[in-house]
């Protein structure tokens, strides 16, 4: 796969502003930063005496991070680009993309190349390298369903390591890289398996409604139709980070056991829920937050978005600490009313 630039000496950027590298727009600063354009540059910094002993943070699109303070260490800005069909067989295409590739642009490219499968994940902010960390998902599809493998550099040693799905240990918005592997690796390339026998995922009510509104027969739907529908839905519901700082969905949809759900539904008969294959039930965190009266409310310059209660926004001038205080207040109220603990999606630093 082509990379954005060849291995070369890495220039260090002292006292570097991260405002343009996080979608909340917080003006945190890094003690030092480096732009990384190849796996070899990640590896070289493992042995570089200029940054010996510094904590390290890999940043892609910055759409899943809340800076509550400056970062007193080395921030590695992943700019590894490139995307290509690396092989195919009778059943599938295998496509690889660099960790610094924009996720949405990559999804659009796969469709333009006639390789559908990722269209339900359109317009999710961030980079390809961040997608496995979070096991991103939307509208009935999780990234892990099309994941083949990834390559990552171990930051402490510079070793290039290959991960299959089992080693990644994917869960709901979760993976090895958020647990035991947190902060240890930089994902430099991800390979996806896209089956040639394409089946549309249009079971979500929002997607079905959008397709119907466009006059598209579900029996004749194309991957591009699903892509366009998802993009339209997300643009209608979610604020553009360039206009209003945010990190997308701030809370995970909680999953509870069937007994707890039965008790909850007895008190809240109109609760929004989604049965899971293992017998548990996923709840809509946005509905819980809305019922607690938080939708559209603000604490200072941090607020809950008026159209989507899952999204916390920076109205202008908010700090990471302000957003975190708002998140804690929401979690407290949801726990008090429903007995359900919300888990935050972004990493708070």
UniProtKB/Swiss-Prot annotation:
Its cofactor is FAD. Keywords: Cell cycle, Cell division, Cell shape, Cell wall biogenesis/degradation, Cytoplasm, FAD, Flavoprotein, NADP, Oxidoreductase, Peptidoglycan synthesis. The lineage of its organism: Bacteria, Pseudomonadati, Pseudomonadota, Betaproteobacteria, Burkholderiales. The active site is at 173, 249 (proton donor), 345. This is UDP-N-acetylenolpyruvoylglucosamine reductase. One of its GO terms (biological process) is peptidoglycan biosynthetic process. It is found in: Cytoplasm. It catalyses: UDP-N-acetyl-alpha-D-muramate + NADP(+) = UDP-N-acetyl-3-O-(1-carboxyvinyl)-alpha-D-glucosamine + NADPH + H(+). It comes from Burkholderia pseudomallei (strain 1710b). GO terms for molecular function: FAD binding; UDP-N-acetylmuramate dehydrogenase activity. Belongs to the MurB family.
């Amino acid at each position: 796969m082509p990379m954005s630039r060849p291995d070369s000496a890495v220039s260090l950027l002292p006292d570097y502003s991260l405002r343009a590298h996080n979608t909340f727009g917080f003006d945190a600063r890094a003690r030092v930063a480096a732009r990384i354009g190849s796996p070899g540059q990640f590896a070289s910094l493992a042995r570089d005496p200029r940054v010996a002993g510094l904590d390290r943070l890999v940043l892609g699109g910055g759409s899943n991070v809340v800076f509550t303070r400056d970062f007193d260490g080395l921030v590695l800005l992943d700019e590894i680009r490139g995307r290509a069909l690396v092989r195919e067989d009778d059943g599938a295409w295998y496509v690889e993309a660099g960790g610094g590739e924009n996720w949405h642009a990559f999804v659009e490219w796969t469709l333009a190349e006639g390789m559908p499968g990722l269209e339900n994940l359109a317009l999710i902010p961030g980079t390809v390298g961040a997608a496995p960390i979070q096991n991103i998902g939307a509208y009935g599809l999780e990234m892990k369903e099309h994941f083949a493998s990834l390559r990552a550099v171990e930051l402490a040693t510079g070793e290039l390591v290959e991960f299959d799905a089992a080693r990644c240990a994917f869960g709901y918005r979760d993976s090895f890289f958020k647990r035991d592997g947190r902060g240890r690796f930089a994902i430099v390339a991800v390979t996806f398996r896209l089956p040639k026998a394409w089946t549309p995922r249009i079971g979500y009510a929002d997607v079905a409604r959008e397709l119907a509104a466009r006059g598209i027969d579900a029996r004749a739907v194309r991957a591009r139709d699903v892509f366009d529908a998802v993009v339209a839905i997300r643009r209608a519901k979610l604020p553009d980070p360039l206009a209003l700082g945010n990190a997308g969905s701030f809370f995970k949809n909680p999953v509870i056991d069937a007994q707890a759900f039965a008790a909850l539904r007895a008190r809240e008969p109109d609760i929004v829920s989604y049965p899971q294959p293992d017998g548990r039930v996923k709840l809509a965190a946005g509905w819980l937050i809305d019922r607690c009266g938080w939708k559209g409310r603000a604490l200072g310059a941090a607020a809950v978005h008026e159209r989507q209660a899952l999204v916390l926004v920076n109205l202008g001038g908010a700090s990471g600490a302000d957003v975190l205080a708002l998140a804690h207040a929401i979690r407290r109220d949801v726990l008090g009313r429903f007995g359900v603990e919300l888990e935050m999606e972004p990493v708070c630093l």
